[in-house]
């Protein structure tokens, strides 16, 4: 019995040290090519008058981030966490509840990160990469899927038809960085 307790204590200690792999501090282990600084949070304002895509700027592509909170009520639930998004290591905006926003990017390959902004839920991160062409639009949907013991943040590419439907139902989000 004493041996089991010793092994349990050693195992917990080893797991606690895994955040500092390969001699790097934990912050440098964060997926720097996609996610932004961990301490950046946003306040989100919803604009219910904006419904729909906008044409891309000349020489740029647009990447849309649409969050579907799964409630089917077309708005932000009071307790629903904010979802923030990064492209190539810089946060570009956030959604709260069912909402969307777009960001202009240069043509080429990009790395996308989405993360829940919450102190109540454990860190939830999803990653993707995409290659974009000037004049084109690309769409990602996030959903927080919960069950009895599991919470998953899902990030998926969707087509323009699905995005068009979601634009018609959801307000546009404008995120302001918290100081």
Segments predicted by a language model, with ranges:
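Hydrophobic h-region of N-terminal signal peptides that target proteins for export
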Residues: 7-16
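Sec-dependent signal peptide recognition
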Residues: 1-7
